[in-house]
Every structure is written in C-alpha cells, then in structure tokens.
Amino acid sequence: MISSLHRPTVARVDLEAIQANIDKIQRHLPKKVKTYAVVKANAYGHGAVAVSKAVEDQVDGYCVSNLDEALELRQAGIDKEILILGVILASELQLAIKHQLTITVASLEWLELAKKESVDFSQLHVHVKVDSGMGRIGVRSLAEANQLISILSDMGVQLDGIFTHFATADESDHAMFDKQLTFFKQLVEQLDKRPALVHASNSATSLWHSETIFSAIRLGIVIYGLNPSGNSLSLPCPLKEALSLESRLVHVKQIQAGDSVGYGASYVAAEPEYVGTLPIGYADGWTRNMQGFKVLVEGEFCDIIGRVSMDQLTIRLTKAYPIGTKVTLIGQQGKQVITATDVADYRGTINYEVLCLLSDRIPREY
C-alpha cells in the first residue's frame, strides 16, 4: 500500500524515546542478558527498518514474525541476528540460510518436511519453541523436545536456543503463569542436550517477573513506551510513548439543529454547532467504533461525531477553527494527552492492536 504523502495525516515516531525506553528497561533488569528488540508487525506500527536502525547499538538482535519481515531488515542493510518467531515453510529454508536468519522449529512433523529439502543444514541456525501453555506452536513434552533436538543434532543444524512464551504474564492472577514457568524450567533442566541460549521473557515478564530471565529477553511493546497490561499493572519504571497520530482540518462548517452527520445519519445536532472534517478513517486503522471518542484541538477535547468513514471522520468544534488547524488523535496537546491505551480502552481492545492497525496509508515521520 502506498503511503498518502499528500494529505495532512501523519504518525510521528520519536526514535529517541524508543532508545531511552530500552536504556531504562535494561537498567531495571537484575542482570545483563542478551537483548532482542521485537520489531514484528512493522515494529508495532512504528516502522521496522527505522526502529531497528535506531536501536542497533543497544540490542543484540531482532525478533520478527515471519520470513518477509526478516528479509525486509536484511535488504535495509541490518546485519545483526534476526530470529523469526513464527514457523516458516520448509520450502523456504534456503532463503533463511542465504540471508543468515535464525528460524523457529516447533514440531517433529515440520522437521520431517525440512529434512527433505536439499540445503546445507550446517548453515541453518534454529531456536526450538516450547509450548508451555500458550497453545499455539511448540513442542509440548520433554520427550518431544529431546527427540527434536536429537534429530537437529544429527542433521548438523546450529542449535542456538530454546524458548517459550507466556499467556498471562501481564495479569495479576499468576496461577497460569506459574504453571507455565514451572513446566518450562523443568523441561530445560532435564534436556539431554541444552542449547546455549534460553529465553522466556517478553515485555511483561521482563518488567514484572525477573525469575523468567534466563540468558536472553525479548522486548516488544515496552520499547515503544506502552504498558503491556494496559493499566492493570503499574510500570516499574517510567516510559515515554513513542508514537503520536496527527491530522489537520480540511473542512469546517456550521450546522443547524436537526442536521445530521455521517453514514446512517447516526448523529443529529441538537443545536447550531461547528463541525470539522479530518482526512483519516477506518481504512487507516481508525476504526468505525471510534464515534463518540475525543481528539485534541488546540489543547481542548473535541468529540468525534457521526460514524467514522473509510477515509474521513468528523468532529464537533468549539468554534470555527481555520482549515489546516492541527488535530491530535494520539499524543499530547498542551496539558492534555490521549494515549494508545486510552484508544484501546474505548474500543474494548489492547494498545498493541491500536498501533498495529495503523495502516501503511499513514506516513511515518521520524
């Protein structure tokens, strides 16, 4: 998708804030360990290449979701380790080897398919994924893990690491978390052959569960300045939200009592009022259910009225602002702030989703 560079809607990304967030988190950790920056999903909407380059001196490697995300970083000249967290097609192994990418191996069935590929397995770097209770991908028993590692060794593969992922690390109830941690610890301790790198810590566990820090951590949403729990748990160190979302008024008018605005005529004015139009809509990731939420105009909150359209939305203004007036959808104006978590709470979702949904139509400025 082509970025819409010729309309006044933009996501501004503060790379220095991301750098500062990483520094604060690393100083908070009880020990120095290998650090991966998680830049999957276009760095949670912040721009994978720009973020990866900005933090290159602070991290040991990167985590992405799939092969294409890894290739994007390599093609941008990023040469540090890249771990693909998802499962790639066995038929794509040669690409992973060619670009020196580390892949995840999650099952014996996949490994049998991989063995059929004509590649130099001695050049392949892998981490084994353990499903300790998340229920997505990974080996689910010590026997399966030992068998998989044995086959990988026989193939001559570079077995670099083993890892798991927690389902409830950002929740106050620790029962499921404790169950997963115990399972993973016992499995790792009993392996016939233990890889050098062991990691289980994502953003939430790095902040609130230092007992999960083995020899590496994977820092995701926290480096972008957001709380993994939303507002359920307090951050142990202050972070700065790195992304702000701005647009500008492209049309301003006065409507009268009884006039309607938007699809379905779902908003009807009760009295004369000023209405402004912004060039951003649900095709940009600002979803239809944001009707009734607020934006900031000159430091004052203004309501979104009418349904959010594909490309535009309308707001109720306190006066007739001139065309070109800046409007903040996420970020700070004056003393007022709208956070991605505020948006998420209104939508009934999580701050991760809010940022990841911001489409490529919105240019990122650094």
UniProtKB/Swiss-Prot annotation:
Q: What is its EC number?
A: 5.1.1.1
| Active site residues per record | K40 (proton acceptor), Y263 (proton acceptor)
Q: Which cofactor does it need?
A: pyridoxal 5'-phosphate
Sorted alphabetically, which Gene3D superfamilies does this protein's record hold?
Alanine racemase, Lyase, Ornithine Decarboxylase, Chain A, domain 1
Physiological role: Catalyzes the interconversion of L-alanine and D-alanine. May also act on other amino acids.
- Give the record's family classification: Belongs to the alanine racemase family.
Where are the N6-(pyridoxal phosphate)lysine residues found in this chain? K40
- PROSITE patterns in alphabetical order: ALANINE_RACEMASE
Binding positions (substrate): R136, M310
* Database matches in CDD domains: PLPDE_III_AR (cd00430)
- Stored Pfam families: Ala_racemase_C (PF00842), Ala_racemase_N (PF01168)
> Which parts of the chain are coiled coil?
none
Q: According to its UniProt record, which reaction does this protein catalyse?
A: L-alanine = D-alanine
What is the protein name stated in its UniProt record? Alanine racemase
The entry's cellular-component GO terms read: cytosol
**EC class (word):** isomerase
Which UniProt keywords are present, listed alphabetically?
Isomerase, Pyridoxal phosphate
Offer one example of a GO biological process linked to this entry: peptidoglycan biosynthetic process
Task: State the InterPro entries in the record.
Answer: Ala_racemase (IPR000821), Ala_racemase/Decarboxylase_C (IPR009006), Ala_racemase_C (IPR011079), Ala_racemase_N (IPR001608), Ala_racemase_pyridoxalP-BS (IPR020622), PLP-binding_barrel (IPR029066)
Query: Care to name a GO molecular-function term for this sequence?
Result: alanine racemase activity
Question: Which pathway is this protein assigned to?
Answer: Amino-acid biosynthesis; D-alanine biosynthesis; D-alanine from L-alanine: step 1/1
